[in-house]
Amino acid sequence: MNEELNDARRDFLKVAAALPAVAVAPWAIAQGPVVAAGPASAPDIAPVDRVFITNEDSNTISVINPMSNAVDTTINLTSFDEDARPPFRFVTGGVMPTHAAMIHKPLYHGCIDAHGAVPNPDGTLLATSGRGSSNIYLIDAVNRRVLGNAANPQAGTTTNPERLSSGILLGREPHEPAFTRNGKELWVTLRGEDRIAILDVGQALKQVGGVPSNAVRAYVPTLNGPAQVWFSKDGKLAFVISQKVAQLEILEVNPDANGHSRPRRLRLVDLGTQDKPAFTPFQKLSPDGTQMWLSHKLADAVSVVSVKDPGTVLATLALGEMARPNHLEFVDNPRGQVTYMSLARVDDGGPNAAASSRLAIIDRSVPLAQQKVVGMVYTGGREAHGLWTNPANNLLYVAHEQDELPGTPNAGQVVCSAFDVSTPLQPKLITQIPLGSLKLPSGELRNKKSINLVYVRPGTKGQTA
C-alpha cells in the first residue's frame, strides 16, 4: 500500500514538473512580479463584504472581514454553556474534550458536522447544513447570527446569552444546500439517502422564528447519494451530482405561477467513463452559464458538461494522480479567464518551507479542446477545500481542513488563505489568516476543519442569483 502511494506521489510530481514554468516553482512564481499589462486594480471590497467558512469539527462558522483579513466574528452552532451545570458545559472540571468527543457530551443539542454553506441570491441569507445532526440552519448574513436562537433564561456571567435554534430537521446526511435562482426555495441534497429536500424559504424563516409552519414543501426522489444541486443561469434546470453512483441527473425545475418548483426528470447521464470511482462532491456553473463543471475527487479529474445540450460531456481534464480535487472557482477579469481547482493532497515545499496543498490553474481563455492545467500554486494551508472569489474577480479566499504543522507561523491553527488574482494565471498569496477560537464562558473552542467557504456582499446579486 505504501509503495502504491509513493508511486502515485511520484506520478503527481511528474505531472507538476511537466507543466509550464508557472508550475515548476509554484510558490516562487506566485510571489514574483506580474506580467507587464498595466497596473493591477486594487481588490474590490465593500464595507459589508464578509467571508463565511464552515468548520466541521468545531461546529462553528468563521467570519472574515476582507478589509482587515482577520476573523471578526465566530458564529456558534454548538449548544455548550447554555446552563451552568456540568453536563451542559464545554469544559467540565478543567477538562476540555477533544473535537470528536465534544458532540457526545450529555444533553448536547447543537450542530454536528457543520458542512455546506451557500448564500441566497442577494447575499442576505445563508443556509448551512449539519451533516451529522441532519438539519440546516439559516444565518443572517448582514448581522452574522443564527436565525431562530432564543433568549437564554439562564443567561449570566458563566453562560451564553442565547439558546441555539434546532434549525430544520431534514433527513440523513444533508450535504450541500442550494437556493433556487428566484430565492423562493432551498434545495438540500440528502447524501445519506436518495432524495432532495425542497424548502419554502418564506415558511422556513417562519418556522425557525417559532411560528408553526411546514417549511419542507416536498422530498424529490433522485440519485443514490446526491451530493449537490446547482441551477442553470435561467433557473430552469437543476443539475444533481452523486458521491455513490457515476451519474448526473438533470431535472426541470418547472416552476408554477408562484415560482415554486414542480421538478421532473429531464435526463440521466452515465458518467462511468469520466468518474469510475463514482465520487463527485462538487459542481459549479461557468460565468457565462453555458457549462457545468464537475469535480471528480477520486478520479482526479474535472468534467465540463453542456447546459445548452443538457448533460452532454464536452471534456474531461486530468489533474494528476492523487490530486484529489475538492471545490472549484472561476475567475474572469480583463487579464484572463481561469478555473481554480482546490486540491486536497498535501506536498512539501510550500510557504515557509511547510507542507501545503495547491490550486490547479486551468486556462479558459483558449478553446475548450485546448484547455488543461497550465500551472499550480501552493495555497499556504493543508488540504484545501472551499474557495470563492469577490464580485470583481480579483480576490480569492481558500479554506483548509487540516491544522498547520509545528514549527510554522500558525502552528496548531487551521488557516484561510487570501490571494490577489487580478492576474488570474499568476495568483499571489496576500496572507494566511488563522481562524482562532470561539470564546465560550467555560473555555475556548478552537475552530477546526474548514470545509465550505463563500464570499458574500449582502444586498448585491451574487453567484446564486
What are the functions of these language-model segments?
Residues M1-D11, V15-P26:
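N-terminal secretory signal peptides
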Residues G38, P43-I45, S342-A354, A399-Q413:
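Short, conserved, GDST-rich strand-edge loop motifs in beta-rich repeat architectures
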Residues S58-N59, S133-S134, E193-D194, V245-A246, ...:
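Short glycine/acidic-enriched loop and turn motifs that connect beta-strands
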Residues S68, A141-L147, D200-G209, L251-H260, ...:
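Short loop/turn segments immediately following beta-strands, especially the blade-tip
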Residues T73-I75, A101-L107, G148-A150, E162-G167, ...:
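A short beta-strand motif characteristic of beta-propeller blades
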